[in-house]
Amino acid sequence: MRRGTASPHIFTEDFCMEIDKRLIVLLKRSADEIKKTVIGKDDIIIKILMTACAGGHILLEDIPGVGKTTMAVAFSKALSLKYNRMQFTSDVMPADVTGFYMPNRATGEFDFKPGAVFCNLFLADEINRTSSKTQSALLEAMEEGAVTVDSVTRKLPNPFIVLATQNPSGSAGTQLLPESQLDRFMIRLSMGYPTVGEETEILKAKSSKKAAPEVNPIMTAQDLIEIRSAAEDIFVSDEIYDYIARLSGATRSDRRLELGVSTRGSLAAAAMAKCAAMFKGRNFVIPEDVTFVYTDVCAHRIIPARVKGKLPSDSEVREILCDICRGVTPPKI
C-alpha cells in the first residue's frame, strides 16, 4: 500500500484473537491484487472493499475516463464474483434490468429470461442518464435483493452488490437521482484525476508491449459472506452509538443544511465503522473508525441550503459536513 495514501492502521499485523486472521489476509491480498490495474487509488479500493463487507452498494460519481469500469472489473475478478455491466441510456427499459417473460414455441409456455441484475456484482454505468422507471427497477433489486416480474418475486444471487457510476450534475443528458435512491447507496466516492506521477505510470503501462497484469481470484463469494458475518459481530459500545447519533443529530439542526442525515445514514455509518475496525484487526469500534467513514457514507444523504440562490458545490457540502463533525466531541475510549 502506497505510503501517504492509505488510512493509518489499515491491515495491521496486531490482529485480535477473536477475528479470523485468514479473512483479514484475504482482504489484504484482494486489495493488493486490485492495485495491479488500478493505480493510485488505495483509499478508494479499501472503502469499496469495506462497503462490500458491510453488505452495501457503492456510487462512484466522476467524469468519464478516470477508471471506474477498470475498478469494477478488477474488483469482480479478485473476489471471484459473477459480473454484469449495463450502460444506462435513455432507452434502457426496466425489463432489461429485472428480466422478462418470452414465449417458448416448443412448450407453448412463457419462460423467464433473467435481466442484467442476476449476478453478484452489477455495474450500473451512468445511472443518472436513464429514466426514473428504470432507476426504480434497480432500486427494488438494491433494497430487497430480489426482483418482481409479473407478480413473481425472484431472489438475486448472494452476495449481490451494485457498483453504480454517475456523471456530475450538470453534465449533458443527465438528471439528478432522487434522494430516496441516493439514500440506498451505502457510500458515494469520487476517484478523481490521478496525480502527474500516477498518470505517467498509467501511460507507461498502457504503452508497454508487455501484457497488462492479470487480476487473479483471491477469495470466493462464500469468503465474502463469511467476512460479512464476522463484520456484524464487531462490538459497538453504547458510547459509539451515541456518538453516531450525535453526529447525525448535529446535521439536522445545522442552518447550512435543509435536510440532515437520516436514520438509514446512521445505520450505514455504524455498519461501515464495524468494517473499518475489522480491517484494522480489532473486534471493537473506536471513534476514529466512525470519522474515517462518516463523510463518505453521509455526504450524499444531506441537502444543503441555498446561499444567495445557489447550491454549494459537492466539495463545499463535504466541508460543511466535516465542519459539523469537528464540532461533535467524540467519546474517550
Outline where the language-model segments fall.
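Conserved alpha-helical scaffold flanking the Walker A/P-loop in AAA+ ATPase domains
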Residues: 47-50, 103-123
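Walker A/P-loop
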Residues: 52-89
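Conserved beta-strand position immediately N-terminal to the Walker
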Residues: 58, 122, 160
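Walker B catalytic acidic pair
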Residues: 125-126, 137
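Conserved AAA+ ATPase small/helical "lid" subdomain
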Residues: 214-269
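C-terminal engagement/docking regions of AAA+ P-loop ATPases
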Residues: 253-333
